[in-house]
């Protein structure tokens, strides 16, 4: 459960400028097939309508960084879901033991998973009725359309119809998550985890040391982040240029640095690594996550909207 939210928004960092892109990579003709689900954007995160045991729709956060789906304690109480065993939930700020509830079926459009035992977390900390994790996404292709505020769920066993205009990056799967190894920050190689549930991009201490050593740049700011478990994570944030993902080079990217427990979970404490949050992803027009086939596709916005954010390196 790796969702993070900014806790002290008025004392943190200046967000990145609106994104940019080269005309050659603008995709105005991409045909999206599959099950399109209405979504809304609260701040930078994406929410979709989900049915729980045929009840709903209920508003769930889409979190590609979470290994299992979650329901809020309020929704669990409202639907009188049977209580199960207590489990230990790993958040960005630490671990917490929470009760689980039995869910017969979670339905996203025409896709359904269940039965599952879902951790029940505080609705106040989730900011939603629940959270869709990779247990529901493992065989899916997820298209996040930040312009239309919609999410398209597809069966990734079906062939993907490419237009030739998307930027394709191949990822690895580790503990279910997509990890991009073709990434760097200021020419330092990093492992990049796609995390749609986090509002901010997070770097580990190994990356901070590689970039700055023991010094603290004058424009680096102390911030606090709130995890879905309700715990607070202290971090340092700074805007950086020359962040590369595949052939894409991003500028003015805000990265918060902290020793978050999930880095250890993925074996990424010693190697420089980042979690790519929705603050970064939402600067693109569309982002497609294909979990089965380990593919991430980025579609740009018009050049006039992304002039100072993204360029391509051939």
Give short role names for the model-derived ranges.
Residues 2-314:
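Pepsin/retropepsin-fold aspartyl endopeptidases
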């Amino acid at each position: 459960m790796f969702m993070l939210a900014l806790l002290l928004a008025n004392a943190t960092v200046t967000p990145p400028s609106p994104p940019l892109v080269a005309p050659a990579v603008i995709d105005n003709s991409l045909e999206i097939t599959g099950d399109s689900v209405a979504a809304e954007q609260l701040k930078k995160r994406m929410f979709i309508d989900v049915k729980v045991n045929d009840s709903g729709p209920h508003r769930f956060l889409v979190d590609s960084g979470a290994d299992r789906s979650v329901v809020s304690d309020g929704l669990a109480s409202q639907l009188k879901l049977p209580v199960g065993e207590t489990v230990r939930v790993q958040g960005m700020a630490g671990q917490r033991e929470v009760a689980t509830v039995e869910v017969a079926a979670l339905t996203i459009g025409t896709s359904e998973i269940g039965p599952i035992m879902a951790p029940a977390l505080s609705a106040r900390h989730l900011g939603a009725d629940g959270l869709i994790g990779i247990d529901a996404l493992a065989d899916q292709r997820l298209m996040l359309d930040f312009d239309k505020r919609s999410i398209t769920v597809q069966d990734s066993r079906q062939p993907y119809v490419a237009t030739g205009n998307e930027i394709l990056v191949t990822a690895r799967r580790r503990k279910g998550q997509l990890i991009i190894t073709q990434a760097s920050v200021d020419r330092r190689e990093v492992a990049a985890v796609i995390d749609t549930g986090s509002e901010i991009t997070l770097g580990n201490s190994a990356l901070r040391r590689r970039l700055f050593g023991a010094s603290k740049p004058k424009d680096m700011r102390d911030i606090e982040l709130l995890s879905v478990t309700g715990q607070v994570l202290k971090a340092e944030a700074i805007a950086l240029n020359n962040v590369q993902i595949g052939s894409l080079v991003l500028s003015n990217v805000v990265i918060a640095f902290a020793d978050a427990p999930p880095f250890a979970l993925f074996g990424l404490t010693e190697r420089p690594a980042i979690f790519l949050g929705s603050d970064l992803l939402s600067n693109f027009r569309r982002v497609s996550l294909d979990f089965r086939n380990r593919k991430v596709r980025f579609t740009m916005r018009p050049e006039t909207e992304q002039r100072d954010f993204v360029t391509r390196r051939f």
